[in-house]
Amino acid sequence: GGSCGQCRVKVKSGGGDILPTELDHISKGEAREGERLACQVNVKSDMDIELPEEIFGVKKWECSVISNDNKATFIKELKLQIPDGETVPFRAGGYIQIEAPAHHIKYSDFDVPEEYRGDWDKFNLFRYESKVDEDIIRAYSMANYPEEFGIIMLNVRIATPPPNNPDVAPGQMSSFIWSLKEGDKCTISGPFGEFFAKDTDNEMVFVGGGAGMAPMRSHIFDQLKRLHSKRKMSYWYGARSKREMFYEEDFDALAAENPNFVWHCALSDPQPEDNWDGYTGFIHNVLYENYLRDHEAPEDCEY
């Protein structure tokens, strides 16, 4: 316990002194204000606590699958239809929890387009099955932004066993999500989250890779399409090869429409057919070497 720092509460009275396990997540100033990690507080008598207001706005919805398409070899874009007349009042950078029932799913039933099947066949991934005996819940960040109304959009990477340990069980929730087809029902709850942009004029630097695209897309679309922000911002995205890039037309359009926004992609394993002349390597290194190292005040940026 105490490792994720997500269960913050404000203790008004009771609970004893803050524990060393909490100090990685809570500053001395926050501790003086009563901030604690709920999982680390021993309840031995009556206490007075204050919970974040957004917790009381959490609801549950049964959604319908609009589409569930591959955007990369191991990433699907799941689009869910919110029930008519309902809204999920999330902020960019937020997440929902998705529920999956007990199931037995065969990877051989997955719909994987021909262009992405090479690696699936190479690593014999269609042999796997996901067997789950109880309901499960997992969290996923929204890829859409608040003004893409009526939907929830997720980028979900299938959690296959690693090549050096092929006998471990595959990811339970990602297997369920990859099995979903148009018209299927899916239950979500939310919204949750604290990964929100600050209301300042500081430069924004977004960095992500793979399915980490989701909150980056949500944030950037929200800044440029809803808020019409004039803040200087850049997006640095990492993918294995050109085939693993997605949403590039969207970001190209945003860059063309907004002179304050640029985006870059680095490929860690470009293929000969890619004819790639852009950045190569891991995106965090590319960001440092080609931008932050010579930036006049990287500490003033918001990441």
Swiss-Prot record:
<dbReference type="InterPro" id="IPR017938">
    <property type="entry name" value="Riboflavin_synthase-like_b-brl"/>
</dbReference>
<dbReference type="InterPro" id="IPR036010">
    <property type="entry name" value="2Fe-2S_ferredoxin-like_sf"/>
</dbReference>
<keyword id="KW-0739">Sodium transport</keyword>
<dbReference type="GO" id="GO:0051537">
    <property type="term" value="F:2 iron, 2 sulfur cluster binding"/>
</dbReference>
<feature type="binding site">
    <location>
        <position position="39"/>
    </location>
    <ligand>
        <name>[2Fe-2S] cluster</name>
    </ligand>
</feature>
<dbReference type="Pfam" id="PF00970">
    <property type="entry name" value="FAD_binding_6"/>
</dbReference>
<dbReference type="GO" id="GO:0046872">
    <property type="term" value="F:metal ion binding"/>
</dbReference>
<dbReference type="InterPro" id="IPR012675">
    <property type="entry name" value="Beta-grasp_dom_sf"/>
</dbReference>
<keyword id="KW-0274">FAD</keyword>
<dbReference type="InterPro" id="IPR039261">
    <property type="entry name" value="FNR_nucleotide-bd"/>
</dbReference>
<keyword id="KW-0520">NAD</keyword>
<dbReference type="InterPro" id="IPR001041">
    <property type="entry name" value="2Fe-2S_ferredoxin-type"/>
</dbReference>
<dbReference type="InterPro" id="IPR001433">
    <property type="entry name" value="OxRdtase_FAD/NAD-bd"/>
</dbReference>
<dbReference type="InterPro" id="IPR008333">
    <property type="entry name" value="Cbr1-like_FAD-bd_dom"/>
</dbReference>
<keyword id="KW-0813">Transport</keyword>
<dbReference type="GO" id="GO:0016655">
    <property type="term" value="F:oxidoreductase activity, acting on NAD(P)H, quinone or similar compound as acceptor"/>
</dbReference>
<feature type="domain" description="FAD-binding FR-type">
    <location>
        <begin position="58"/>
        <end position="198"/>
    </location>
</feature>
<keyword id="KW-0830">Ubiquinone</keyword>
<keyword id="KW-1278">Translocase</keyword>
<feature type="domain" description="2Fe-2S ferredoxin-type">
    <location>
        <begin position="1"/>
        <end position="55"/>
    </location>
</feature>
<keyword id="KW-0406">Ion transport</keyword>
<keyword id="KW-1003">Cell membrane</keyword>
<comment type="similarity">
    <text>Belongs to the NqrF family.</text>
</comment>
<dbReference type="Pfam" id="PF00175">
    <property type="entry name" value="NAD_binding_1"/>
</dbReference>
<keyword id="KW-0408">Iron</keyword>
<dbReference type="InterPro" id="IPR010205">
    <property type="entry name" value="NqrF"/>
</dbReference>
<keyword id="KW-0001">2Fe-2S</keyword>
<keyword id="KW-0997">Cell inner membrane</keyword>
<keyword id="KW-0411">Iron-sulfur</keyword>
<dbReference type="InterPro" id="IPR017927">
    <property type="entry name" value="FAD-bd_FR_type"/>
</dbReference>
<comment type="function">
    <text>NQR complex catalyzes the reduction of ubiquinone-1 to ubiquinol by two successive reactions, coupled with the transport of Na(+) ions from the cytoplasm to the periplasm. The first step is catalyzed by NqrF, which accepts electrons from NADH and reduces ubiquinone-1 to ubisemiquinone by a one-electron transfer pathway.</text>
</comment>
<dbReference type="GO" id="GO:0006814">
    <property type="term" value="P:sodium ion transport"/>
</dbReference>
<keyword id="KW-0915">Sodium</keyword>
<feature type="binding site">
    <location>
        <position position="7"/>
    </location>
    <ligand>
        <name>[2Fe-2S] cluster</name>
    </ligand>
</feature>
<feature type="region of interest" description="Catalytic">
    <location>
        <begin position="201"/>
        <end position="303"/>
    </location>
</feature>
<protein>
    <recommendedName>
        <fullName>Na(+)-translocating NADH-quinone reductase subunit F</fullName>
        <ecNumber>7.2.1.1</ecNumber>
    </recommendedName>
</protein>
<keyword id="KW-0479">Metal-binding</keyword>
<feature type="binding site">
    <location>
        <position position="4"/>
    </location>
    <ligand>
        <name>[2Fe-2S] cluster</name>
    </ligand>
</feature>
<keyword id="KW-0472">Membrane</keyword>
<dbReference type="GO" id="GO:0005886">
    <property type="term" value="C:plasma membrane"/>
</dbReference>
<keyword id="KW-0285">Flavoprotein</keyword>
<comment type="subunit">
    <text>Composed of six subunits; NqrA, NqrB, NqrC, NqrD, NqrE and NqrF.</text>
</comment>
